Amino acid sequence: MPPSASSVGFSDLLNPQNPTESAPSTPVNKSPASSAPSSAQSNSTMASSVSLLPPLMKGTRPANEEPRQDLPRPYKCPLCDRAFHRLEHQTRHIRTHTGEKPHACQFPGCTKRFSRSDELTRHSRIHNNPNSRRNNKAQHLAAAAAAAANQDNVLVNNTGSMMPPPSKPITRSAPVSQVGSPDISPPHSFTNYAGHMRSNLGPYARNNERASSGMDINLLATAASQVERDEHFGFHNGPRGLPLFSSRLHNSSRLPSLSAYAISQNMTRSHSHDEEDVYSHRVKRSRPNSPNSTAPSSPTFSHDSLSPTPDHTPLATPAHSPRLRPLGTSELQLPSIRHLSLHHTPALAPMEPQPEGPNYYSPTQPHHGPSISDIMSKPDGTQRKLPVPQVPKVAVQDMLNPTGFVSVSSSTSNSVAGGDLAERF
């Protein structure tokens, strides 16, 4: 049985020397009638070989490249088992392990990088093609980036003319108030310009952020002190039979409250907004953890409606605190430390709230004893001493009895309230 045409074509393609060897085997002395079928057979063999050529080229290497398999592969990858004939092939392969992309696109506005040069060449065709949509988008992005860079340069060059110097020095200790004063630029113009400032104008922006954080802390402290005052007020308005010194001991044993922090923050802020600090400069705070303290942690004067405590809160002044006059007087001068007495001042008697009448003193009452101005006007330095207050002798039963002893009536005398209470306002 003769072999088929497809098998003959496949063997001839794999072994090119077979046709020369099989040529003598074909009969030469054939009749012309048999030559026509042989020519048709040869044509079909050529067609089948051509049809089989593409899959052979895809699946196997050409015959002229077979000797390349025997070439040495001296360049081996240190990270895997692959070896290469050329050094550049090994270098290109190692970049697949390291992720290095040394080939960057040189087109303005494009930030892409590639590990192989042929990938960069293929990518550059996108920018060179004028009909590509990606090219148009890249051009728009590049133009926008160039315009932004030019605008930044203009802003940096014109910062001296656009930003006026601040009219008041900015301190780190005083928080910035939200109330606008007439000598400060409007806040909206500063915030609009602050978004475009660069690193050389950074301290102003940081001061703004620090001020906002300080204001947040002040708001929290104010809210906490308000709650604390409400609780303190509810405690004092509770049962009338409770003696006041028990609450005084309870208040003096705790740590400094948040209300003292809020008042201290109000005292340290700038005086350009005095409408907020109408009463803060009049408030007298005594230290709650003082060993000689016999007063509550935060006694305040109830002289007007802006006082943080109600009008019927009892007024108590520790015995060791100085007798202060109002800040508006010009003759206020405190004695030096060497002129003060080192003797221990006896504690004041406890006082109870008066149920009726908001006023605890009468400005028209006669003044007993020398005042601070009289003491300070003495020429002799040894005579400049505060008089020792005369504490009334009260029994323990009178102190515990709410109706037996009321010390509010004597709070304006020299022994309890210092005698100069009317001069404080």
UniProtKB/Swiss-Prot annotation:
Residues 31-51, 288-302, 406-416 have a biased composition (Low complexity). The keyword rRNA-binding does not apply. Interacts with creB. Residues 1-76, 116-135, 266-327, 347-386, 405-425 are annotated as: Disordered. Residues 63-73, 271-280 have a biased composition (Basic and acidic residues). GO terms for cellular component: cytoplasm; nucleus. A zinc finger (C2H2-type) spans 75-97, 103-127. Transcription regulator component of the regulatory network controlling carbon source utilization through ubiquitination and deubiquitination involving creA, creB, creC, creD and acrB. Represses the transcription of the alcR, alcA and aldA genes by binding to a GC-rich region in their promoter. Also plays a role in response to carbon starvation and the control of extracellular proteases activity. It holds the Pfam family zf-C2H2. Keywords: DNA-binding, Metal-binding, Nucleus, Repeat, Repressor, Transcription, Transcription regulation, Ubl conjugation, Zinc, Zinc-finger. Residues 1-29 have a biased composition (Polar residues). The gene is creA. GO terms for biological process: carbon catabolite repression of transcription from RNA polymerase II promoter by glucose. Gene3D superfamilies: Classic Zinc Finger. It is found in: Nucleus. Ubiquitinated. Deubiquitinated by creB, probably to control its activity or amount. The keyword Iron does not apply. Belongs to the creA/MIG C2H2-type zinc-finger protein family. One of its GO terms (molecular function) is zinc ion binding. This is Probable DNA-binding protein creA.
